[in-house]
Every structure is written in C-alpha cells, then in structure tokens.
Amino acid sequence: MSTNFQNIIGTQLGQGTITTGYTSFYKVPPDTRTYIKEFDICNTTAGAINVYVSFVPVAGTAGTSNAILYNASIPAYSTLQWCGAQIINASGTVQAKASAAGCTITITGGEAQ
C-alpha cells in the first residue's frame, strides 16, 4: 500500500481587525490545502459585538452556506476561541465581519502542498 505523507508546519495564518463588511483574513495559496486548527476573536470594547466567520471555497461568497460562526455574540472585553479541524482547498478564504468595530481575529493552522 502506497502512502503519501506531507509535512505540515504550524503557523499563524492571518490576523487583523474585523470590520462591518466581510473581509478576507487568509487565502489558501495555489496547489495547497490548509488545515485550520483554531481562531481567536478578541472584543476590545465595552459592549457585546456579534461576529460572523466563513470558510469560503474558491469562487464562493461568504454567508450562511459556509458559516463557521454566524451572529455569535462576544461579550465586552472577552475572547472567543474556536477549535476544530477544517481543511480549506486552494484559493479558498477565511472571511469575517462584525456588527461593530472593536474585534481582532487571529487564525492558526498549517499548509500542505
């Protein structure tokens, strides 16, 4: 039986400030698959903020059909941590938006070619 193993090196894939419109925080390079291990969203404001995160396939649009978080409320001065095991294929993206300014996202995982 032939087995094709690939080295996957863990790394920070993306980080940034979430706005009120969907923004791409990570795009999978060509000829690559990406393993999303976790993402953290930190609310740095005095009020709750609702967030939306989608793992969007190539030529797709962020929304309910590919949501990982949808209208999830993050309390004031709190951090939401999502842990899982999701694979995104070449040219797919991780996109997020929020109901108001004041959140940052950090995405970690690994890439395999």
Language-model segment annotations:
Residues 75-91:
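Beta-sandwich interaction modules
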Residues 1-34, 38, 97-113:
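C-terminal interaction-tip segments
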Residues 91-97:
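Short, surface-exposed ligand- or partner-binding patches at beta-edge/loop junctions that are enriched
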Residues 17-23, 73-80:
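Solvent-exposed, conformationally flexible loop/turn segments
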Residues 41-46, 99:
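Short solvent-exposed strand-capping/beta-turn motif centered on an Asx-Ser/Thr pair
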